[in-house]
Structures are given as C-alpha cells and as structure tokens.
Amino acid sequence: MLNVGATAPDFTLRDQNQQLVTLRGYRGAKNVLLVFFPLAFTGICQGELDQLRDHLPEFENDDSAALAISVGPPPTHKIWATQSGFTFPLLSDFWPHGAVSQAYGVFNEQAGIANRGTFVVDRSGIIRFAEMKQPGEVRDQRLWTDALAALTA
C-alpha cells in the first residue's frame, strides 16, 4: 500500500455513467477521498457506501471530492448507484483488471478484487491519509472526515 507522503498515481477511469474521470482533474482544485471497495451489491460495501451517501456533504463540497473505485464494470455500477441513490462517481478499475488498485497497493491478487483501501489526496497530489482493511473488516469513516478536515484547517 502506498504511504502517506507519496505522490498519488494518476488514473483515468470510467464512472457509472461511462464518463471519464481523472485524478489530475482535481489537482489544484480539490482534495480527493479515494475509496477502494471490493464489489458492488455486497454487504460491507453496501453499508460503507450507504454511509458515504448519507454523509456526502462532508466528503463532497467546495474543498473535496469523493471517488469510489472497484474492479466492477460501469453497467454494474450504474445499476447499483441507481438502486442505492449514489450520486458520487463509482469508478471502474475493470480493464486492465485492477491496474489502479495495483498502483495504490490495495489489489488482492488471490481474490482478483481491491481490498478496502482509503486514501486522502491533497490538492497537490500528495497522499495525506492511507489505510487498508482486509476482507470482512469495516472502515471507520470518522478517520476520513478528520483527514479531510486537517487539510482545510
């Protein structure tokens, strides 16, 4: 997993609406919360992204943006986003399979999916918060809000 202080690898991925999203597009403008999740329509992932949705103004505002990333394809993400009311981008790390997850060091080779990795990237592209949970472990989203708040203090 990439460490705090490292430069966040740039990427271009398709969201649930087939739109291209690049990390560098936020450079100089917003801090970015990157939330890697294993798969759509799974218990812990549903719960975590429901919490993100329910507290979205804390993560998606004038100072920050939230991007969720998994190896699932955009059509699956579209259905899940529609059913769950997710308005933030769900990015597809589908092909090359898991390339962005691998670049961030959160790809689970054995399972072929991303582990629950979370990164806060500042406006200059530097990682200011990094964590990774193993399958079955739930993340504490208060850590994300604290990390983002520290960048705007």
UniProtKB/Swiss-Prot annotation:
SUPFAM superfamilies: Thioredoxin-like. The keyword tRNA-binding does not apply. One of its GO terms (cellular component) is cytosol. It holds the Pfam family AhpC-TSA. The keyword Methyltransferase does not apply. It catalyses: [mycoredoxin]-L-dithiol + a hydroperoxide = [mycoredoxin]-L-disulfide + an alcohol + H2O. GO terms for molecular function: peroxidase activity; peroxiredoxin activity; thioredoxin peroxidase activity. This is Alkyl hydroperoxide reductase E. Belongs to the peroxiredoxin family. AhpE subfamily. It is an enzyme of class 1 (oxidoreductase). One of its GO terms (biological process) is response to nitrosative stress. PROSITE patterns: THIOREDOXIN_2 (PS51352). The lineage of its organism: Bacteria, Bacillati, Actinomycetota, Actinomycetes, Mycobacteriales. Residues 2-153 form the Thioredoxin domain. Its EC number is 1.11.1.29. Homodimer. Forms both dimers and octamers; a tightly-associated dimer and a ring-like octamer. The active site is a conserved redox-active cysteine residue, the peroxidatic cysteine (C(P)), which makes the nucleophilic attack on the peroxide substrate. The peroxide oxidizes the C(P)-SH to cysteine sulfenic acid (C(P)-SOH), which then reacts with another cysteine residue, the resolving cysteine (C(R)), to form a disulfide bridge. The disulfide is subsequently reduced by an appropriate electron donor to complete the catalytic cycle. In this 1-Cys peroxiredoxin, no C(R) is present and C(P) instead forms a disulfide with a cysteine from another protein or with a small thiol molecule. The active site is at residue 45. Keywords: Antioxidant, Oxidoreductase, Peroxidase, Redox-active center. Transmembrane segments: none annotated. InterPro entries: AhpC/TSA, Peroxiredoxin_AhpC-typ, Thioredoxin-like_sf, Thioredoxin_domain, Tpx_Peroxidase_subfamily. Thiol-specific peroxidase that catalyzes the reduction of hydrogen peroxide and organic hydroperoxides to water and alcohols, respectively. Plays a role in cell protection against oxidative stress by detoxifying peroxides. May represent an important antioxidant defense against cytotoxic peroxides, especially peroxynitrite, which can be formed by activated macrophages during infection.
